[in-house]
Amino acid sequence: MRRAAPSGTTARHATNPLRNRNQGIPIVATSIEQSFVKQFQTEVHESYQRLGSKLRPTVRSKTGVKGASTVFQRVGKGVAGTKARHGAVPVMNLEHEPVECFLADYYAGDWIDKLDELKINHDERAVIANAGAYALGRKTDELIIAALDAASREAVGAGAGQTDGDGLTKQKILLAFEMMGAADIPDDGQRFAVIGWKQWSDLLQIPEFANAEYIGDDELPWKGTQAKRWLGTLWMPHSGLTLNGTLRYCYWYHRTAIGHAVGAEVQTDITWHGERAAWFVNNMMSQGAALIDPEGV
């Protein structure tokens, strides 16, 4: 049944539910399509796993942390002893030292204009997703590198007439190798060495590292520049290591020497801002890192 509009009001105005009665301004919808949100969140998470941190897999990582900090336990060495017949078993009295790791929140956000995807030839969502993944991945590595910097043991002054400015020489590597062994660092396949790209080039000049006569065809570094196993250690180049003047810090460590804590994995929040006609994409995470055992670095 058709109803007539009240006197003095046109039917067009009476049947428009999107018009503000006080100001005469159309109400703008502020919701974003759920399919777009879900697709974007998936892209960010997958990109972080693929393109993110290089160092996180090399350290002891704890996920699902509740609170602003967590504790990693460092246990001392035990000593075995004998006992008399029917006597008491000697007690090792292992030292337990808690190492607290503080977490911090990190963000990587950017804007996506509603009409940008109609004007550009590339996938803007993929670009923002990759950029956020790289930023968060670099921050994870920065936290781990800062924890490595807290260690104090250094392999310096190796070889007669050599200085720290001579690059990464075989003598320095062997000195560090001896220090790892003297400290009883387990040779269990969980040793890692992270060096700069210049130092990676120095390694390629060492026959024992790059010559098939020493290491065989399967371990040649020329097949890929990401990582290579040598001396029971996985070696990898990294561009974000600490630079002190002209000296690049390189690190040789055991996985259990560094602790990495995760309170929140990479998350994505997308909100619509009508005054900008754009979405703001905020990628965020909560993480921290700490030096657990200085002897292991």
Model-flagged regions — what are they?
Residues 226-271:
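Glycine/small-residue-rich hydrophobic helix-like segments
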